[in-house]
Amino acid sequence: MAETDSGKTAEERIPFNYFKKIPKIELHAHINGSISSETIKKLIQRKSTKEKGQNNVVSQWETTILKGDEKNLDECFKMWDFIYPLVDDTEAVFLVTKSVIEDFAQDNVRYLELRSTPRANPKTGMTKESYIEAVLAAIEEAKTTVPDITVR
C-alpha cells in the first residue's frame, strides 16, 4: 500500500466497503467473462459428476486460472479454453447467468447490460436458440431473487 501525506493508506482513508455501497451501472458485461471462482468450482463439480474421468478439469483450472495474480494477455485468453467446455449445456448457461446477475447485485450494481455470443453444442443438445432461452430464463428469475437490479 502506498502511504499518503496523512500517513494512512487509501484503504484506511476510504474503506473498500464504501465503494461497494455506491449504486453502480455496468453497460458491457460478458457473461462468461464475469463468472466468479465460486461458480466455476460449482461448474467443475457438476461436470466431474456428470462425466467421470474429468479430474483433469480441476488440474487445468489450478494451472491456468489460479496460477498467481499476475497474468499476461495470452494467459488471460486461455481462460476461455477452460470455461467454454464447462458452460456447454442450457443448465450451465442458466446457472452461470443467474450467478453473474447475483454477483453484480451483491456489488450494488443497479443496472446491468449482459453480453454473450450464443453457442450451439450438438453433444449436449444445446442450440443457439436454447442458449438464448436459458439466458432469458435466468434474467426473468433474477427479477424475483434480486429485484433491485435491472438486467438487459
Task: Name each model-derived stretch.
Residues 2-152:
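Metal-cofactor-binding active-site regions of metalloenzymes
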